[in-house]
């Protein structure tokens, strides 16, 4: 049975949060979910940062959509991140649409949905809000923090901003700043949304409608970038969609067309168009080096966190080189870092899929870090 957004777990963050744009928010909701139990020694907490279109429902069943959690392949009883053993925390980012403060919420100044009056947010703003959740849950230091894609960006920002908050960290398939190609793809998605007349300069929420066509196209753009060329060719090739020959029309003749349309229009039922604008903007603004006067090494100074950086060989959205650049900076800063490139043809989305080598690597690192963290806390 579906739950309503109003009924999900959330805290009200009362202390003011000064945003990078100069504005301040306070008394705002931050929605979250936890899995497993925090043990008596409080040495088993793992914070998961979600990606662009994710949410706090990491595993099990999402009570809003009735679909599987977005990382059910990796998180759950007996899985790589074992919820019988670890206490897993995940929050919906501010700017999102699954219960945390976002552009579809009511602006107290006029009792209308924020729309484009919502302040522009950054990855750093997201992370600072989530640190308040750890305070609420009584977690002073995490066993591990992890996340893929935008989740990995949040993780890097978290470690730079709060260098003593995590014993270990696993950034997955991410980058320390958005490339021109990343920005271009996000701009294409935003323009698709804004070109939909229903978008109406972000005011559609007050009319109880959604710019479905624009949002669906934005999602299609994303899905292309999440796959690899080889993986897409092997999965679809030029195969037709339930027909023997071309229709000589603009219907979905090819399986790949049908796939993109399905993914696009299924997405509009669970996500807010303005949230895509705000979150992709936060990703584009992310540049950890810029925050530290052009030096990524400076961002990671004074780190006691133990890092495992993971990339995927066929990921062209956040390439192996970009992930290796993070490793180089961590090494140069004196941080404890290891690196693993997973060989796969499944592209950027590999971290969400059942990739045995990836899951084995994830589990091995977390379990070994738990033993070290327990020993450290005994001293």
Model-based region annotation:
Residues 113, 117, 124-143, 157:
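Conserved acidic catalytic loop of the alpha/beta-hydrolase fold
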Residues 33, 37-107:
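N-terminal cap/lid subdomain of alpha/beta-hydrolase-fold enzymes
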Residues 325, 331-379:
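Catalytic active-site module of serine/aspartate enzymes centered on a nucleophile-bearing elbow/loop
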Residues 152-163, 169:
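Short glycine-enriched nucleophile-adjacent loop
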Residues 1-48, 379:
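Catalytic-loop region of hydrolases
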Residues 171-266:
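Alpha/beta-hydrolase-fold enzymes
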Residues 303, 309-311:
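Short beta-strand/loop motif that positions the catalytic acidic residue
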Residues 291-296, 319-330:
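Short alpha-helix in the alpha/beta-hydrolase fold that links the catalytic acid
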């Amino acid at each position: 049975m579906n739950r309503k957004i109003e009924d999900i777990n959330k805290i009200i963050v009362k202390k003011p949060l000064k945003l990078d744009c100069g504005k301040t928010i306070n008394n705002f909701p931050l929605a979250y979910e936890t899995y497993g139990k925090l043990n008596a020694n409080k040495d088993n907490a793992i914070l998961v940062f979600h990606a662009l279109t994710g949410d706090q429902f990491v595993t099990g069943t999402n009570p809003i959509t009735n679909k599987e959690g977005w990382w059910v392949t990796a998180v759950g009883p007996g899985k790589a991140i074992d919820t019988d053993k670890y206490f897993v925390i995940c929050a919906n980012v501010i700017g999102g649409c699954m219960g945390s403060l976002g552009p579809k919420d009511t602006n107290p100044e006029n009792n209308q949905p924020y729309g484009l009056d919502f302040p522009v947010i950054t990855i750093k703003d997201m992370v600072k809000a989530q640190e308040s959740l750890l305070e609420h849950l009584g977690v002073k230091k995490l066993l591990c923090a992890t996340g893929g894609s935008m989740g990995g960006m949040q993780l890097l920002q978290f470690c730079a901003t709060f260098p003593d908050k995590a014993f270990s960290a696993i950034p997955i398939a991410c980058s320390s700043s958005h490339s021109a190609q990343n920005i271009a793809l996000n701009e294409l998605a935003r323009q698709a949304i804004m070109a939909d007349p229903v978008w109406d300069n972000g005011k559609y929420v007050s009319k109880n409608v959604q710019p479905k066509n624009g949002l669906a196209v934005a999602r299609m753009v994303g899905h292309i970038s999440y796959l690899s060329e080889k993986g897409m060719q092997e999965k679809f090739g030029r195969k037709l969609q339930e027909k023997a020959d071309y229709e000589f029309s603009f219907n979905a003749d090819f399986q790949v067309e049908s796939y993109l349309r399905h993914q696009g229009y299924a997405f509009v039922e669970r996500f807010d168009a303005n949230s895509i604008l705000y979150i992709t903007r936060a990703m584009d603004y992310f540049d950890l080096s810029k925050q530290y006067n052009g030096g990524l090494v400076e961002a990671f100074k004074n780190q006691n966190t133990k890092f495992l950086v993971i990339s995927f060989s066929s990921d062209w959205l956040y390439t192996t080189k970009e992930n290796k650049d993070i490793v180089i900076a961590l090494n140069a800063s004196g941080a404890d870092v290891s690196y693993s490139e997973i060989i796969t043809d499944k592209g950027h989305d590999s971290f969400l899929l059942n990739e045995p080598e990836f899951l084995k690597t994830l589990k091995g690192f977390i379990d070994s870090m738990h033993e070290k963290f327990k020993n450290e806390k005994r001293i």
